Protein backbone atom coordinates (compact mmCIF):
# COMPACT_ATOMS: atom_id res chain seq x y z
CA UNK A 1 0.00 0.00 0.00
CA UNK A 2 1.40 3.39 -1.02
CA UNK A 3 1.44 6.35 1.34
CA UNK A 4 -1.31 8.04 -0.67
CA UNK A 5 -3.55 4.98 -0.47
CA UNK A 6 -2.77 4.67 3.23
CA UNK A 7 -3.78 8.28 3.85
CA UNK A 8 -7.03 7.63 1.97
CA UNK A 9 -7.58 4.63 4.23
CA UNK A 10 -7.07 6.85 7.28
CA UNK A 11 -9.57 9.35 5.90
CA UNK A 12 -12.20 6.67 5.38
CA UNK A 13 -11.62 5.30 8.88
CA UNK A 14 -12.03 8.81 10.30
CA UNK A 15 -15.34 9.32 8.49
CA UNK A 16 -16.66 5.98 9.71
CA UNK A 17 -15.67 6.97 13.26
CA UNK A 18 -17.72 10.16 12.87
CA UNK A 19 -20.75 8.09 11.89
CA UNK A 20 -20.16 5.77 14.86
CA UNK A 21 -19.80 8.73 17.24
CA UNK A 22 -23.17 10.16 16.18
CA UNK A 23 -24.95 6.80 16.00
CA UNK A 24 -23.92 5.74 19.50
CA UNK A 25 -25.75 8.73 20.98
CA UNK A 26 -28.94 7.12 19.68
CA UNK A 27 -28.16 3.39 19.87
CA UNK A 28 -26.60 1.86 22.98
CA UNK A 29 -24.06 -0.84 22.12
CA UNK A 30 -25.59 -3.94 23.65
CA UNK A 31 -22.89 -5.23 25.96
CA UNK A 32 -22.33 -4.86 29.68
CA UNK A 33 -25.00 -2.86 31.46
CA UNK A 34 -26.86 -2.26 28.18
CA UNK A 35 -27.08 -5.83 26.90
CA UNK A 36 -30.55 -6.89 25.72
CA UNK A 37 -31.90 -9.97 23.95
CA UNK A 38 -32.52 -7.90 20.80
CA UNK A 39 -28.79 -8.07 20.03
CA UNK A 40 -29.11 -11.78 19.32
CA UNK A 41 -26.94 -14.75 20.23
CA UNK A 42 -24.42 -14.08 22.99
CA UNK A 43 -21.41 -15.97 24.32
CA UNK A 44 -19.37 -15.90 27.51
CA UNK A 45 -18.06 -12.42 28.24
CA UNK A 46 -14.59 -13.79 29.00
CA UNK A 47 -14.36 -15.72 25.74
CA UNK A 48 -15.77 -12.80 23.75
CA UNK A 49 -13.14 -10.39 25.09
CA UNK A 50 -10.34 -12.81 24.25
CA UNK A 51 -11.64 -13.42 20.72
CA UNK A 52 -12.23 -9.70 20.19
CA UNK A 53 -8.90 -8.34 21.45
CA UNK A 54 -6.46 -11.11 20.50
CA UNK A 55 -6.57 -10.39 16.72
CA UNK A 56 -4.89 -6.99 17.03
CA UNK A 57 -2.14 -8.51 19.17
CA UNK A 58 -1.55 -11.19 16.52
CA UNK A 59 -1.69 -8.73 13.61
CA UNK A 60 0.93 -6.50 15.21
CA UNK A 61 3.18 -9.49 15.90
CA UNK A 62 2.98 -10.64 12.27
CA UNK A 63 3.59 -7.16 10.86
CA UNK A 64 6.52 -6.66 13.23
CA UNK A 65 8.12 -10.01 12.36
CA UNK A 66 8.09 -9.26 8.62
CA UNK A 67 9.43 -5.73 8.98
CA UNK A 68 13.08 -5.04 8.20
CA UNK A 69 12.96 -2.32 10.87
CA UNK A 70 11.74 -4.59 13.64
CA UNK A 71 14.81 -4.26 15.86
CA UNK A 72 15.38 -0.54 15.43
CA UNK A 73 15.23 0.76 19.03
CA UNK A 74 12.38 3.26 18.63
CA UNK A 75 10.30 0.96 16.43
CA UNK A 76 10.78 -1.94 18.84
CA UNK A 77 9.80 0.30 21.76
CA UNK A 78 6.57 1.30 20.01
CA UNK A 79 5.85 -2.37 19.41
CA UNK A 80 6.40 -3.24 23.09
CA UNK A 81 4.22 -0.37 24.33
CA UNK A 82 1.33 -1.35 22.06
CA UNK A 83 1.60 -5.04 22.90
CA UNK A 84 1.71 -4.43 26.66
CA UNK A 85 -1.75 -2.92 26.38
CA UNK A 86 -3.19 -5.64 24.19
CA UNK A 87 -1.60 -8.54 26.04
CA UNK A 88 -3.33 -7.29 29.18
CA UNK A 89 -6.58 -6.59 27.35
CA UNK A 90 -6.72 -9.89 25.47
CA UNK A 91 -5.22 -12.41 27.87
CA UNK A 92 -5.37 -10.99 31.42
CA UNK A 93 -8.38 -8.64 31.62
CA UNK A 94 -10.91 -11.28 30.43
CA UNK A 95 -9.76 -13.79 33.04
CA UNK A 96 -10.27 -11.22 35.80
CA UNK A 97 -13.91 -10.64 34.88
CA UNK A 98 -16.42 -11.85 37.45
CA UNK A 99 -19.92 -13.20 37.06
CA UNK A 100 -21.55 -14.97 34.13
CA UNK A 101 -22.23 -12.02 31.83
CA UNK A 102 -22.42 -12.55 28.09
CA UNK A 103 -21.59 -10.49 25.01
CA UNK A 104 -23.61 -10.59 21.78
CA UNK A 105 -21.76 -12.14 18.85
CA UNK A 106 -22.70 -9.06 16.80
CA UNK A 107 -20.81 -6.76 19.18
CA UNK A 108 -17.85 -9.10 19.33
CA UNK A 109 -17.71 -9.36 15.53
CA UNK A 110 -17.67 -5.59 15.11
CA UNK A 111 -14.88 -5.40 17.67
CA UNK A 112 -12.86 -8.03 15.82
CA UNK A 113 -13.25 -6.15 12.52
CA UNK A 114 -12.12 -2.86 14.04
CA UNK A 115 -9.17 -4.46 15.81
CA UNK A 116 -7.97 -6.10 12.60
CA UNK A 117 -8.17 -2.79 10.74
CA UNK A 118 -6.56 -0.88 13.59
CA UNK A 119 -3.73 -3.37 13.95
CA UNK A 120 -3.00 -2.96 10.26
CA UNK A 121 -3.33 0.82 10.52
CA UNK A 122 -0.82 1.14 13.37
CA UNK A 123 1.58 -1.52 12.14
CA UNK A 124 1.65 -0.36 8.52
CA UNK A 125 2.78 3.12 9.52
CA UNK A 126 5.27 2.19 12.22
CA UNK A 127 6.91 -0.80 10.55
CA UNK A 128 6.69 0.08 6.85
CA UNK A 129 5.58 3.58 5.82
CA UNK A 130 7.18 5.93 8.36
CA UNK A 131 10.19 7.75 6.85
CA UNK A 132 13.39 5.89 7.68
CA UNK A 133 14.89 9.07 9.14
CA UNK A 134 11.93 9.77 11.43
CA UNK A 135 12.24 7.30 14.30
CA UNK A 136 15.96 7.49 15.02
CA UNK A 137 17.60 7.25 18.46
CA UNK A 138 17.12 10.98 19.14
CA UNK A 139 13.35 10.34 19.13
CA UNK A 140 13.73 9.02 22.69
CA UNK A 141 14.69 12.51 23.89
CA UNK A 142 12.07 14.39 21.87
CA UNK A 143 9.15 16.13 23.63
CA UNK A 144 6.77 13.98 21.56
CA UNK A 145 8.14 10.74 22.97
CA UNK A 146 8.59 11.93 26.56
CA UNK A 147 5.17 13.58 26.94
CA UNK A 148 3.41 10.85 24.98
CA UNK A 149 4.99 8.06 27.02
CA UNK A 150 4.02 9.71 30.31
CA UNK A 151 0.42 10.06 29.12
CA UNK A 152 0.36 6.54 27.69
CA UNK A 153 1.36 4.83 30.91
CA UNK A 154 -0.61 7.20 33.15
CA UNK A 155 -3.72 6.41 31.12
CA UNK A 156 -2.97 2.68 31.14
CA UNK A 157 -2.56 2.59 34.93
CA UNK A 158 -5.71 4.68 35.43
CA UNK A 159 -7.63 2.30 33.18
CA UNK A 160 -6.37 -0.75 35.10
CA UNK A 161 -7.12 0.86 38.47
CA UNK A 162 -10.62 1.84 37.36
CA UNK A 163 -11.35 -1.66 36.04
CA UNK A 164 -10.18 -3.05 39.39
CA UNK A 165 -12.59 -0.77 41.25
CA UNK A 166 -15.49 -1.86 39.03
CA UNK A 167 -14.68 -5.56 39.47
CA UNK A 168 -14.72 -5.26 43.25
CA UNK A 169 -18.03 -3.44 43.62
CA UNK A 170 -19.93 -6.71 44.04
CA UNK A 171 -19.56 -9.63 46.38
CA UNK A 172 -19.78 -13.17 44.94
CA UNK A 173 -23.33 -13.95 43.83
CA UNK A 174 -24.45 -10.31 43.91
CA UNK A 175 -26.04 -9.05 40.68
CA UNK A 176 -27.01 -5.53 41.72
CA UNK A 177 -25.48 -2.40 40.21
CA UNK A 178 -23.46 -0.02 42.36
CA UNK A 179 -22.18 3.51 41.89
CA UNK A 180 -18.35 3.41 41.94
CA UNK A 181 -16.96 5.91 44.45
CA UNK A 182 -13.18 5.51 44.51
CA UNK A 183 -10.30 6.85 42.45
CA UNK A 184 -11.20 8.95 39.43
CA UNK A 185 -14.81 7.79 39.84
CA UNK A 186 -15.17 10.61 42.33
CA UNK A 187 -15.10 12.96 39.34
CA UNK A 188 -16.52 10.98 36.40
CA UNK A 189 -18.80 7.98 36.02
CA UNK A 190 -16.60 6.37 33.35
CA UNK A 191 -13.09 6.66 34.78
CA UNK A 192 -11.96 3.54 32.92
CA UNK A 193 -12.86 5.21 29.61
CA UNK A 194 -11.05 8.40 30.61
CA UNK A 195 -7.94 6.35 31.28
CA UNK A 196 -8.15 4.65 27.89
CA UNK A 197 -8.61 7.96 26.08
CA UNK A 198 -5.58 9.43 27.88
CA UNK A 199 -3.58 6.31 27.01
CA UNK A 200 -4.26 6.51 23.27
CA UNK A 201 -3.77 10.27 23.26
CA UNK A 202 -0.32 9.45 24.59
CA UNK A 203 0.17 6.91 21.81
CA UNK A 204 -0.77 9.45 19.14
CA UNK A 205 1.72 11.92 20.64
CA UNK A 206 4.63 9.54 21.23
CA UNK A 207 4.39 8.18 17.67
CA UNK A 208 3.49 11.61 16.25
CA UNK A 209 1.44 9.80 13.61
CA UNK A 210 -1.83 10.27 11.77
CA UNK A 211 -2.59 6.59 12.34
CA UNK A 212 -2.27 7.14 16.09
CA UNK A 213 -4.52 10.19 15.85
CA UNK A 214 -7.17 8.22 13.96
CA UNK A 215 -7.02 5.53 16.66
CA UNK A 216 -7.53 8.20 19.32
CA UNK A 217 -10.51 9.55 17.37
CA UNK A 218 -12.01 6.05 17.19
CA UNK A 219 -11.50 5.62 20.94
CA UNK A 220 -13.35 8.88 21.60
CA UNK A 221 -16.09 8.03 19.09
CA UNK A 222 -16.71 4.69 20.75
CA UNK A 223 -16.36 5.57 24.43
CA UNK A 224 -17.67 9.13 24.88
CA UNK A 225 -21.25 8.38 23.74
CA UNK A 226 -21.27 5.26 25.90
CA UNK A 227 -20.04 7.31 28.86
CA UNK A 228 -22.99 9.62 28.28
CA UNK A 229 -25.39 6.66 28.32
CA UNK A 230 -23.80 5.33 31.52
CA UNK A 231 -24.22 8.69 33.28
CA UNK A 232 -27.90 8.79 32.26
CA UNK A 233 -28.37 5.24 33.53
CA UNK A 234 -26.69 6.04 36.84
CA UNK A 235 -28.88 9.10 37.31
CA UNK A 236 -31.95 6.91 36.79
CA UNK A 237 -30.73 4.30 39.27
CA UNK A 238 -28.93 6.38 41.89
CA UNK A 239 -30.48 9.84 41.55
CA UNK A 240 -28.80 12.57 43.60
CA UNK A 241 -26.01 10.20 44.67
CA UNK A 242 -24.37 10.81 41.29
CA UNK A 243 -23.82 14.41 42.34
CA UNK A 244 -21.74 16.67 40.11
CA UNK A 245 -19.81 13.87 38.43
CA UNK A 246 -19.14 14.34 34.74
CA UNK A 247 -19.34 11.65 32.08
CA UNK A 248 -15.73 11.01 31.12
CA UNK A 249 -13.63 14.20 31.22
CA UNK A 250 -13.24 15.53 34.79
CA UNK A 251 -14.90 18.94 35.33
CA UNK A 252 -15.67 19.24 31.58
CA UNK A 253 -18.01 16.58 30.15
Question: Model-derived features: where do they sit?
Answer:
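Membrane-helix and juxtamembrane interface regions of eukaryotic multi-pass membrane proteins
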Residues: 1-87, 92-110
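Hydrophobic transmembrane alpha-helices
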Residues: 2-22, 61-71, 107, 114, ...
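Juxtamembrane interfacial secondary-structure elements that flank transmembrane helices
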Residues: 22-34, 87-91, 100, 125-130, ...
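Context-gated lysine
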Residues: 28, 46, 98-102, 124, ...
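Active-site pocket-lining segments that scaffold enzyme catalytic pockets across diverse folds
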Residues: 106-125
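Glycine- and acidic-residue-rich phosphate-binding/metal-coordinating active-site segment common to enzymes
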Residues: 131-135
Amino acid sequence: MSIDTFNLFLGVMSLIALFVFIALYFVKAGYGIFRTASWGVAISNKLAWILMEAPVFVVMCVMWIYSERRFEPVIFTFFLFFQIHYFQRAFIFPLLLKGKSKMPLAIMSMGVLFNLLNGYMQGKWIFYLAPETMYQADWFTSPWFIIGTLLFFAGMLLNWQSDYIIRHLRKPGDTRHYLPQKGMYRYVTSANYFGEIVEWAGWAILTCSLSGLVFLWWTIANLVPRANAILCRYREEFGDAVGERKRVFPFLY
